[in-house]
């Protein structure tokens, strides 16, 4: 009888004893902090793999874009149709410090604004803030009926549309180029620019639903940690100790 392996015997399957590790055991939660220009600072949490070897967790977090509803940031449901983009610029401990990265409208809100018998006027302009942020702002407006108007339609003439668009770009340029990004964000939340456009164009054609529908960040200046910490209401300078005044006593040697 030949001595050898019996192929008929069932072999044990490989990999049965291998334990499956939960991928979440290698990850950590980090808190996302919104700038102090918003009412609610705690946006949420994000996951990232722990620092292992040359892979640093902070490097994986920096540059992440978070999209949040403005209603959640301001505790006001009237802002539910606007979405704010925040970019992680710095990680301190378990906190991700973010900066404003853009603004947009929800698609359902934009579709609800477009109606029959009225003219839609759009304008966009590229502006530079005083702290060297290059932004492109998109504005939208709709014509409305004049007082005591009998006519069903409210279509504006081409010359009126051009005049309104010129007025829109002038106001956006004036309001955005004379302030910092933080000050511009403070103007965008209560829609100050939209109301300014509505008032300025009353003589050309009455408008309604005037909004800055989108803000796109094209270029940001060189990263400044001090400016970011000030934006979050923190300081990068260490607390200095109090000076203690003591009476000076000269030591007298007893033996020479």
UniProtKB/Swiss-Prot annotation:
GO cellular component assignments: cytosol; cytosolic small ribosomal subunit
Membrane-spanning residues: none
The entry's keywords: Acetylation, Cytoplasm, Ribonucleoprotein, Ribosomal protein
Subcellular location: Cytoplasm
Domain of life: Eukaryota
An individual GO BP term: translation
One term of GO molecular function: structural constituent of ribosome
Residues bearing PTM N-acetylalanine: 2
SMART domains listed in its UniProt record: Ribosomal_S3Ae
Assembly with partners or alone: Component of the small ribosomal subunit. Mature ribosomes consist of a small (40S) and a large (60S) subunit. The 40S subunit contains about 33 different proteins and 1 molecule of RNA (18S). The 60S subunit contains about 49 different proteins and 3 molecules of RNA (25S, 5.8S and 5S).
Family statement drawn from the similarity comment of this UniProt entry: Belongs to the eukaryotic ribosomal protein eS1 family.
Protein name: Small ribosomal subunit protein eS1
Organism (species): Sclerotinia sclerotiorum (strain ATCC 18683 / 1980 / Ss-1)
Name of the coding gene: rps1
């Amino acid at each position: 009888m030949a001595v050898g392996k019996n192929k008929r015997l069932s072999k044990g399957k490989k990999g049965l004893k291998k334990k499956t590790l939960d991928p979440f055991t290698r990850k950590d939660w980090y808190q996302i902090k919104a700038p102090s220009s918003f009412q609610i600072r705690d946006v949420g949490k994000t996951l990232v793999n722990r620092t292992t070897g040359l892979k640093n967790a902070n490097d994986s977090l920096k540059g992440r874009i978070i999209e949040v509803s403005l209603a959640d940031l301001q505790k006001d449901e009237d802002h539910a149709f606007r979405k704010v983009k925040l970019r992680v610029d710095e990680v301190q401990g378990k906190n991700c410090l973010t900066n404003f990265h853009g603004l947009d409208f929800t698609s359902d809100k934009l579709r609800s604004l477009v109606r029959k018998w009225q003219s839609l006027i759009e304008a966009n302009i590229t502006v530079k803030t005083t702290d060297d942020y290059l932004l492109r702002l998109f504005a939208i407006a709709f014509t409305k009926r004049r007082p005591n108007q009998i006519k069903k339609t409210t279509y504006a003439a081409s010359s009126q549309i051009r005049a309104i668009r010129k007025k829109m770009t002038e106001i956006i340029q004036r309001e955005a180029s004379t302030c910092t990004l933080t000050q511009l964000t403070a103007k965008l939340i209560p829609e100050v620019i939209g109301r300014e456009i509505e008032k300025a164009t009353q003589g050309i054609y009455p408008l309604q639903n005037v909004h800055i529908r989108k803000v796109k960040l094209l270029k940001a200046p060189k990263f400044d940690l001090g400016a970011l910490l000030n934006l979050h209401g923190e300081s990068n300078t260490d607390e200095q100790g109090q000076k203690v005044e003591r009476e000076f006593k000269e030591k007298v040697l007893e033996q020479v």
